[in-house]
Amino acid sequence: MNLKQFTCLSCAQLLAILLFIFAFFPRKIVLTGISKQDPDQDRDLQRDRPFQKLVFVIIDALRSDFLFDSQISHFNNVHQWLNTGEAWGYTSFANPPTVTLPRLKSITTGSTPSFIDLLLNVAQDIDSNDLSEHDSWLQQFIQHNNTIRFMGDDTWLKLFPQQWFDFADPTHSFFVSDFTQVDNNVTRNLPGKLFQEWAQWDVAILHYLGLDHIGHKDGPHSKFMAAKHQEMDSILKSIYDEVLEHEDDDDTLICVLGDHGMNELGNHGGSSAGETSAGLLFLSPKLAQFARPESQVNYTLPINASPDWNFQYLETVQQIDIVPTIAALFGMPIPMNSVGIIIPDFLQLLPNKLASMKENFMHLWKLSDHHGEVALDDFTAEDIYTKMYTIQETLTKSATNYNYPLLTLAFVGFLIITIIAIYVLLRYSGPDFWQLRVSSLSVLLVSIILGVSTFASSFIEEEHQLWWWIVTAFSAVPLFVYRLNVLIIVRWFIMMACVRSIKFWNNSGQKFIYSNVMSNLLNQNPSWKWCLNMLTFLVLIMASAGFQVLHFIVTTILVGLCFTYKISWEIVNGNQAEIPLFMHDLLAKIDFAPTESNLIVLARVFFQAWAIVVISRLVLTKLKVLNKNYLIKDMKVYITILLMFQTSSQNIGQFLVFQILESQIFYFFQNIPTASLTSTSKIYFSNLVSLILQNFTFFQFGGTNSISTIDLGNAYHGVSSDYNIYVVGILMSVANFAPAIYWSMLPWSINYASIPAQVKLQTFIRSKLPAFTYHCIFGTCLMTACVVLRFHLFIWSVFSPKLCYFLGWNFVMGLLNGWLPELALLCALD
């Protein structure tokens, strides 16, 4: 197989994956049109509606305990309003995927999200996100000639036309490094655009992002979280005070909610209790005139809850229930695609609660493909709600229609590619079955083990355990291949110690969390952490000292920039107390002031310097100005520095362990008995070991198969608020796949160090076959599992995220990282 054929095969594989994903995650079929009422009925409802103004406040990632739990909540004014009955509180269940765009669609239309909205959450410029033709409570307000003003997350303007808003001041939602200015940009408009012009608007939408950004950076227990709670609480008080001043003019409802929650790492996107349990609050002086929700009467806020409450405070409602509730409270018809149910506590506010219940029931009845009227006269309110909850459950479960023809095409195409990949892998091993090498059979064995595991949701959630067992098994190989002596045994023990250290470094998987892991110990002892980080950087510099003087100088400069940035980043983000004093003195001596603006400049200087160094090294080697014998070592050092730059401080020390482990593995490959391996077998084995370590370290870096553990905190180095989504995407990919990228370089020195130039391309193709075959076999099993288990309880929370990760591994590691750096290296070596 030549390079052109293999390139076509790889592109076809990626295309088949994309086709399968878009067939498996189709856009939901929604009803077109806008709900309307009889003109006379509409006029009466508008006249008698309980509220005239709506202030809709979204505090991004406002988890339920942030509002209600005494151990973490600092919303003191909210607690007071809840206890006086001016506010009614709930825990709202947010259907996964728990990211902003699909949650906003649900909150405004009342429909359940499709999983493809998770992908569109990043690609927010796609026209299909537009809800201007879909019914929503915003559409209903527009139809009833209400004026809407908006401030906050610019995702709203990707969903709704800007001309719908009398005033709009958007802020970027993905710039997670900022959690101060992003909220000030919203609050600055309150005096002028809301308070002073109170009579000029009917609906105000405020979407605050700062709390979510703090979660992404430091988690729910961040030192910044209490102050952010108090800031949001004071903003709500200022709005409520303004409502009280205008109490005689109109009735205003303030609705405060989180679009989703967050997990204990501060991330979201998955289906854990913390991510799906968002806080919900309705606030108005009028509410004090009615009976409080029964669940609220029994408690004095804040609540001292026990851990087994699992974020369920007061009464739990579906987040989509907000939509018909708002529609009823403002005398509007329920949006066309809403599957929500009016929150029962609000029926007492409605002028005709029985009619509202019946309208809600008939709306759901028709959505469930039933036709004709239903006699509800003999049913009690409880009976009607019981039936509505049953219909709602059915509608939310049957929200997806699969594109079976496209699924079949994609799967058959991928299966054909898999058969070709296995054939090519085995053909290079030997001319017949009896000459098949252990190396190729090992590739198939690992692929089949991981592939079969995809049929069990628990194995997907705890995939790291499988890689741990495989790493442990392969670590025993040197004991059987080499003639044992003291040196071999010592190196083997060092290798095992490194593997165990990596396993101990972070929590991995989704089911169990342990407190005594290395990353937690380092965070609790920051002086140890930074001494270890400094040692890691120094070892990298010293490792380059034996090559060339120019390389040593360049490495020292890059390491200096990287280390200075990592220290400065901690200081700017409020962790200056964790930085040892001598490092503060170091910054003072180089006259660098750690500020947010200086951080952006420093990061850009690093990236530019790194790019110049890498490109220059490749070009000068190609021109034979620099010695090509050191090119592979030099490039590995430069790439490692970039990976450390994109790594969180508690994980930088892992690269020291990586370097020690790599040196032991390299020794074993260099000294393997000649009779034990053919050249092809050596290529296969080195790349199989690389593949195993890529996956093993990915999980031990803190990665999982859940969307919620994607690292966004390191995706904005050098990025200002006016960011480029493609740059952020590249930085995010490097940050999340940093350990995998490191181990993808392992075979370079083994496979390319001493082979003739004319066989380098064939070596490249053979080196890609193990990973390519693995992804083909694993992907075939995963696709089969997704189709067979498409009605499984965990299809959206476990299998679908894994499908997205599979795409990421193939695109980032298989295509971008697997091809571009290595081909550039081979081109320079010619």
Swiss-Prot record:
Disulphide bonds in the chain: none
GO molecular function: CP2 mannose-ethanolamine phosphotransferase activity
Alphabetically ordered keywords of this record: Endoplasmic reticulum, Glycoprotein, GPI-anchor biosynthesis, Membrane, Signal, Transferase, Transmembrane, Transmembrane helix
Protein's UniProt keywords contain Transferase: yes
Record topology, Cytoplasmic segments: 343-405, 461-469, 555-598, 673-682, 746-768, 827-830
Post-translational modifications reported in the UniProt record: N-glycosylated.
Membrane spanning stretches: 322-342, 406-426, 440-460, 470-490, 534-554, 599-619, 652-672, 683-703, 725-745, 769-789, 806-826
Glycosylation sites: N145, N185, N298, N506
Membrane topology classification: Multi-pass membrane protein
E.C. number(s) listed in UniProt: 2.-.-.-
Record has Cell inner membrane as a keyword: no
Stated role: Ethanolamine phosphate transferase involved in glycosylphosphatidylinositol-anchor biosynthesis. Transfers ethanolamine phosphate to the GPI second mannose. Although not essential, addition of ethanolamine phosphate to the second mannose plays an important role in cell separation via the GPI-based modification of daughter-specific proteins.
Family: Belongs to the PIGG/PIGN/PIGO family. PIGG subfamily.
Identification of the protein by name: GPI ethanolamine phosphate transferase 2
Species of the source: Saccharomyces cerevisiae (strain ATCC 204508 / S288c) (Baker's yeast)
Name of the gene encoding the protein in the UniProt record: LAS21
